[in-house]
Design a protein with these regions (language model features):
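Catalytic cores of secreted or luminal carbohydrate-active enzymes
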Residues: 145, 150-156
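Beta-rich carbohydrate-recognition and catalytic domains
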Residues: 1-30, 34-81, 88-140, 153-155
Length: 156
């Protein structure tokens, strides 16, 4: 982990790195978000062909809350570059959570691709509302590493 005290101009490595370790292959690509309902930081981490979901109160100590992916979505390649975001449902007052998963290879036309899952998230566990359906963000053969930003100007 690294941190900044000057709004991202410079970074310092945390003295007690690593903050999280694993014996699993392909343990990478952490995405960290703030979960307002639980008042905790949430990290989604790619591990092989699954996503692991962790929580933390301080960004230094992490607890494994759940795993997602077994039996869901495409598994033609390594799962990478996860993202987790809450979005409004158009025309309603509802919101749903979207878990984004990039894989390489394994896309519908070969090469890399981005799949996504829509469902609920309670701060510990993501539940896919349609596990029998694989949803693709793009039908090209090289769409990859989709990311979102937090606190962007004008809520973009």
């Amino acid at each position: 982990m690294a941190y900044s005290l000057d709004n991202g101009k410079t970074f310092k490595k945390y003295a007690r790195n690593p903050i999280l370790t694993s014996t699993q292959r392909d343990f990478r690509d952490p995405k960290v978000i703030w979960h307002e309902d639980t008042k905790k930081w949430i990290m989604v981490l790619a591990v092989g062909q699954e996503m692991e979901i962790y929580s933390s109160a301080d960004l230094k100590s992490w607890t494994l809350e759940s795993k997602f992916g077994e039996g869901q979505g495409a598994h033609g390649g390594v799962w990478e570059c996860p993202d987790l975001l809450e979005l409004p449902v158009e025309g309603t007052e509802l919101k749903k959570w979207v878990l984004v998963c990039n894989l390489n290879p394994g896309g519908p036309f070969g090469g890399s691709a981005t799949q996504y899952f829509v469902g609920t998230f309670d701060g510990k566990r993501f539940v896919n509302e349609s596990p029998a359906v694989t949803k693709w963000m793009d039908w090209g053969k090289d769409h990859y590493a989709t990311v979102t930003w937090s606190d962007a100007p004008d809520n973009r």
